[in-house]
A protein has these predicted regions:
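Transmembrane signal-anchor hairpin modules in multi-pass inner-membrane enzymes, especially those
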Residues: 1-131, 168-171, 175, 241, ...
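Transmembrane alpha-helices of multi-pass inner-membrane enzymes
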Residues: 234-237, 295, 409, 431-473
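Aromatic-anchored transmembrane helix interface
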Residues: 85-94, 114-124, 136-161, 181
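Hydrophobic transmembrane alpha-helices and their immediate junctions
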Residues: 394-440
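Long extracytoplasmic/lumenal interhelical loops at the membrane interface
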Residues: 335-395, 414-419
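A membrane-periplasm/extracellular boundary helix in multi-pass inner-membrane enzymes
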Residues: 186, 192-196, 270, 287-336, ...
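Hydrophobic core segments of transmembrane alpha-helices in multi-pass, intramembrane catalytic enzymes
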Residues: 40-47, 85-95, 144-156, 226-244, ...
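Alpha-helical transmembrane segments of multi-pass inner-membrane proteins
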Residues: 46-51, 120-124, 128, 154, ...
């Protein structure tokens, strides 16, 4: 029916319907009794508009997801160990975007995607044993943790095979991620120096100094080791980028140098020795990959860390003295008192090894993913602080084998991209390959599978590197 055929009265009512609804909505907000009630009335339309805007372009949900993931703290809601975070809601929007644009996905399933699927399947396979040995409530929490890890896998799949707007520049999005990372590291430095009130769900990690007690730098993450691992990731990027031509990197060299100092300073404030070891392992890998003199790479990395150490010495001298004493004692007592150097990890590993020796059948399927810290089934509540041992006990040989296979696929995919003729793929491939080599070293002293706040960033770089390696040079 043409507009002319519609009676004038109906056209007038239709034209007035939307303005009238907006007016009534505005009046309801104005007359609402309190600020929270006003927010409740205003939120649904504003949220719907934001979701609609996000879905208009393929990359928008991902950009919003990373901003919320890295730059917002958890909400002070008493649910779980660390409160509730808003980033999974953005991941749900991303899932909706993927469903809407289903026809734009690449249909080929590469072997690395299958490796991710096998590992998630192994985690899910352990959940019935979590319910059997530790109760259904703990099994439900373990299922949620598998879901958090699955978010990182979805980000990887999106970067690898998801919809992409024509003319998309991976280096431009890398620059965006880099800036977001710098903001997160800057906040971590400010948080440590000024000791802001801790966000909900933070770990109680402190450094005892002669003139007081300081909370280790955690930034907007849940604990200090996550921050240290995150800073190590971008510090490796700075090192890789400084060895490549300007046209192949996302930022100018002076900017990379300044950012490297920020990440190195935040890394020192996190008080994480394992993250420094990861950076050194990544540098050795980079030197071997580029067939460069290892001294050149290590000298540049050491210079950056020394400058950052000088900044720490200037602003927080008592912390610097304690930090260097800790490093010195780590070398001095490594053979004399290894359990003390490893902050009790050796005793924990011995306990878990004894548990598997006494109950070898649990080494097949495990006792349930992420049950060790919350269940006394192994004798007492334990934090393994070792990704490999934790997976062996909690998911059995099946889970550990799937995880090792996944790591092999990650290294193989990163190495193939690093050797690509596509300069973007080569840069991203060198970055993720070298970092993941260091990551596998750091896994010996931490359960890095649970770092769901930072794994999506790592897997986006991995997926983009592999995708760019298959694109024309």
């Amino acid at each position: 029916m043409s507009p002319a055929a519609v009676p004038a009265g109906k056209r007038l009512r239709a034209d007035l319907a939307i303005p009238a609804a907006l007016g009534l909505w505005s009046a309801a907000i104005a007359l609402a009794p309190g600020p929270w009630f006003k927010i409740a009335l205003a939120a649904p339309p504003a949220t719907a508009a934001a979701i609609w805007w996000t879905l208009l372009r393929p990359h928008r949900w991902l950009a919003a997801f990373f901003v919320f993931l890295l730059l917002t703290p958890p909400l002070p809601i008493p649910l779980g160990d660390s409160g509730v975070h808003t980033a999974p809601l953005l991941a749900a929007v991303g899932l909706l975007a993927g469903l809407i644009r289903m026809k734009e996905w690449r249909t080929t399933v590469p072997p690395i995607a299958q490796a991710f699927g096998w590992f998630i399947g192994a985690l899910l396979l352990s959940l019935p044993f979590a319910a059997l040995y530790s109760g259904p409530d703990l099994a439900e929490r373990s299922l949620l943790r598998v879901g958090l890890f699955a978010i990182s896998v979805y980000v990887f799949l999106w970067a690898l095979s998801g919809p992409r707007q024509p003319g998309t520049d991976s280096l431009r999005f890398t620059r965006f991620l880099f800036v977001v990372g710098i903001l997160a590291a800057l906040f971590a430095c400010a948080d440590f120096y000024f000791q802001f009130p801790a966000p909900a769900g933070y770990e109680q990690q402190f450094v005892w100094l002669d003139d007081g007690v300081l909370r280790r730098a955690q930034g907007l993450f849940y604990e200090a080791s996550t921050l240290g691992n995150f800073c190590a990731f971008f510090l490796v990027m700075c090192i890789v980028a400084l060895l490549r031509p300007r046209r192949e990197i996302p930022c100018p060299r002076p900017f990379l140098g300044i950012a490297g100092l920020i990440f190195a300073t935040a890394l020192l404030f996190s008080y994480s020795r394992a993250s420094i070891v990861a950076v050194l392992a990544a540098c050795v890998t980079l030197a071997a990959l580029r067939r460069a003199r290892i001294g050149r790479v290590l000298a540049g990395s050491a210079a950056g860390l020394l400058i950052a150490a000088a900044l720490v010495q200037y602003f927080v001298p008592s912390f610097a003295a304690t930090y260097w004493a800790r490093i010195e004692n780590s070398f001095a007592f490594a053979l004399v008192a290894p359990n003390g150097v490893l902050t009790g990890r050796l005793a924990t590993w011995t306990t878990l090894a004894a548990f598997l020796t006494d109950h070898p059948w649990h080494a097949i399927f495990g006792i349930g993913f992420k049950t060790l810290p919350y269940s006394k089934f192994a004798g007492t509540e334990l934090v393994a602080d070792n990704t490999y041992l934790s997976l062996l006990v909690e998911t059995g040989v099946i889970g550990l084998t799937a995880f090792l296979f996944l790591n092999w696929r990650i290294l193989r995919g990163g190495l193939a991209a690093a050797r690509s003729q596509n300069p973007r793929a080569a840069f991203l491939g060198q970055w993720i390959f070298c970092f993941w080599a260091g990551e596998m070293v750091q896994m010996l002293s931490g359960d890095l599978v649970t770092y769901w706040r930072v794994l999506p960033v790592y897997f986006w770089v991995l997926g983009t590197a592999i995708r760019e390696a298959g694109a024309p040079s």
